[in-house]
A protein has these predicted regions:
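Conserved class I S-adenosyl-L-methionine
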Residues: 1-43, 56-60, 77-80, 136-174
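Short alpha-helix
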Residues: 187-209
Length: 241
């Protein structure tokens, strides 16, 4: 989430169309059913969504009566967020330098944005800094084995059946261009230990971890495929009081 060309500005229209109002399969059927209850659980008064994109999750939280600020470095996405939620609070900013006072928020959300942030060694301490003591950092992220396979995907047999999902260079951090459904952006791969060390070094305590399964109303074929290679994890980290 810096000034470098990461593809997000040119991919913004395709991204917005792909998300719609309800999100893609992973958000709608896997992550939202966990992320929304976790976000509401402690009745936070002030929430920051880091890497809010076009503002979909901000709108979900605002419909629940929360005071939400969304930040993103991509002008087109912030413009779309403001257009869809004229009463909302959205700002162009990077995760590595949050323009907020210390201890300003009860809850900070990173909803599939860590993979887009070039410098998490700067960003995670910033998220911890703006949390009040006792506040939570709620994270949805891609499993690191998934980002170690972004250029390969499923290996298929001659009949087109999915055989296995290979990973390579898992311990080597990298930034890779990925393309899907008209979107072309940079994703950052890091081993799980990189994220955990950064969160622990920021003084945060892990209080919740899940690899959520699709909800019962998810499309059956996609749910079966997800069960073979689950893409997502959810973590909640608390700043000690």
């Amino acid at each position: 989430m810096s000034g470098m060309d990461n593809g997000w500005e040119t991919s913004a229209d395709a991204w917005i169309a792909d998300m719609g109002e309800h999100g893609d399969f992973g958000r709608r059927y896997v992550l939202d059913p966990v992320m929304l209850p976790r976000a509401l659980r402690q009745k936070p008064k002030k929430v920051l969504d880091v890497g809010c994109g076009e503002g979909r999750f901000c709108r979900m939280l605002r419909r629940q009566g929360l005071e939400v600020t969304g930040i993103d470095p991509t002008p087109a996405l912030i413009a779309a967020a403001r257009a869809r939620d004229k009463a909302g609070n959205y700002a162009r900013a990077t995760a590595e330098l949050l323009p907020f006072a210390n201890e300003a928020f009860d809850l900070v959300v990173s909803y599939l944005s860590l993979i887009d942030i070039p410098d998490i060694q700067a960003a995670i301490p910033e998220m911890a800094r703006v949390l009040r003591p006792g506040g939570s950092l709620l994270i949805a992220n891609l499993n690191s084995f998934n980002t170690a396979c972004v250029n390969t995907g499923w290996i298929k047999g001659s009949d087109g059946q999915r055989l296995y999902y290979p990973i390579d260079n898992y311990l080597q951090e990298s930034a890779t261009w990925i393309e899907y459904r008209g979107i072309r952006v940079i994703n950052h791969h890091r081993p799980m230990s990189t994220y955990l060390r950064a969160l622990l070094d920021a003084g945060l305590h892990l209080t919740f971890f899940d690899e959520p399964v699709p909800s019962t109303n998810a499309p059956a074929a996609k749910a079966r495929g997800y069960g073979r290679v689950p893409w997502f994890l959810v973590m909640e980290w608390v700043k000690p009081a």
